[in-house]
Structures are given as structure tokens and as C-alpha cells.
Curated annotation (Swiss-Prot):
Coiled coil: none annotated. Pfam families: Abhydrolase_2 (PF02230). This is Acyl-protein thioesterase 1 homolog 2. It catalyses: S-hexadecanoyl-L-cysteinyl-[protein] + H2O = L-cysteinyl-[protein] + hexadecanoate + H(+).
Amino acid sequence: MSNLIEIKSKSTHTATVIFLHGLMDTGKGWETRMENIISMGGLDHIKFVLPTAPTIPISINFGNKGTAWCNVTAFYPGSEEDLIGLEKSMKLVEALIEEEIKNGIPAERIILSGFSQGGALTLYTGYQSKHKLAALITLSGFSPSLSLPSKIKPENKDIPLTMFHGTDDKVVNCKWGELSHKSYLKVGIKNSQFISITNLDHSSNEFELKQVHDLIEKYLPK
């Protein structure tokens, strides 16, 4: 995959975090924030992989091209879904997971995470993957498809899930994130939590990044 950012582990590599950016962004755009998380300590054994989405026409951007994991017509529940684009991007992420496994990192030592549309792809891939991952973490994420809950593989239902969302998010409303989480609870995703962050808009902050750090340290211990 082109434009792939890798932050190498500082000690022996025994675990990996794959982080997926949001619409019109790049893996490079999240590099500094991932380095901030690493600087909080305890993650020297972990490699961070930050891919960049393909460049495609985006309906919400008046058809102009930009980086996106799939086409977007609107950011609200029930908007038109680009399932073909989601499936293509899921294959890209699965290839990254399989590359880590090929290099000696078992699936249960890999966390998949993402922001906004990257969070949506995290859910879409993580719950349908043939590889049972260590955990899924989303920031300002949402369910990318109304049909996803019915597609979840039974063996993946106990993958730990944490969804963070800012209460002041004007792009992906916090209520959408909360409804997405509830839709997973209804199909048996019990090991999960939804955490709203007061006064946070469609972005991340130090408090949220510290929570992400603590989860990575929990699910990918040395």
C-alpha cells in the first residue's frame, strides 16, 4: 500500500496497532498523535501502522477526489451506503493484518482502530475478519452499514470494543455513535463500552488519546 506510515517498535516487536484515518486525511496526518500516545510509556514493543486511503471521487465533496475508504453521500444514519467501496477497503486492511501475521505477530496481538470513517471501517473489518483481533477502538466512529450487525461473525462477538465520541461533534453526531453501539449490543457484542467526551468536537484531545493509550497497554501488554 502506498503512503504507508510505520512507526517501528523501540524494543522487540511483539504487537501491532493499525490505525485508520478519517475522510480527506492521510496516515501521515495521525503520525504525531500516535507518537504522543507512544510517549506516554509502556508501548515500546508495539509497531504502529498508519495506512492512507485510496483517492476517489467523494459525493459529499461535490464529486471532487480525495482520500476516502469509501464514497460518502452524507454523515447521518440511513444515508446511501457504498458497500462496494467498504468491501474493497476491508480487503486492504485485511492484507495489512495478514502481513503482520506473516511476520510473526498473531492476530490476538493486533489492535484495529480508527477515526471517523476510519472508525467505521474498523467496525466493518474487525467484526467480519477471519482473524480474531485483540481489540477494536474507534474515535468519532459509527456503524458504516445498517446490515453490519447481521454480518458479524459469531467467533468475533467477544472482541473487546471501545467507542469514543465527543459530545459536541457536528460532523458525526454523538447520538449516531451511541446508536451504533446499541445496535451491536442488540446482536450480542457484550464486551464493549461507549464513552462520550464532554465538549469534544469532531477531533481528538489529550484526554481521549490517554484513554486510547491505556486501552492499548491493557490489550497488548508486554
